[in-house]
Amino acid sequence: AGGWVAVVVILVICLIGLLVSSVFGIFFSGEDSGNGMTMQTVVQEINTEYDSRLDEIKNENAYDVLEMSGSRAVWKEVLAVYSVKTTTDQDNPQEVATMDDNKKQLLTDIFWEMNEISSRTESKTETVITETDDGHGNIVQTETTQTRTYLYITVSHKTAEEMADQYGFDDEQRQMLSELLADENNSLWSQVLYGISVG
């Protein structure tokens, strides 16, 4: 009986090893592998870099009105693309359960390939009507023109599907991507990104 237990234990260890080294290893990436880096800390750093780029644009331009539009890619999609691309790389396949400087750079590059920030300024001359009292109880309307500078910041993003096209993913890689992004994995994504275990 003891022999069977050993076989079962070995099989379980092998299965866990296979899972961790597959695209699903991303769901184990919340732990520090000894270098102080986790998926959460790297995502926070990239988010900070993203916010800094937005602030940079605001600080570099003199403006009266700020108009922001668009949205960035959902982190779950960025990480799914990273996981498939990294584990199935023909030249240098790597597991994604751990994080290091090299993988951090890969993830950062994918994030910026999926997210683009563009900006422009435009001067507009607008008519402003001000109402004043003439001192005798009469309202006097005065029209003046003002030139105001508008700063437009647009964030555009690519979906996981668009990145699969860009990277030339084959059918098997697209299937992996689809499985990672399935709704039943949402609680696993929450755990990876926020350390939150749901349900």
Where are these regions (language model features)?
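Membrane-proximal envelope biogenesis segments
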Residues: 1-198
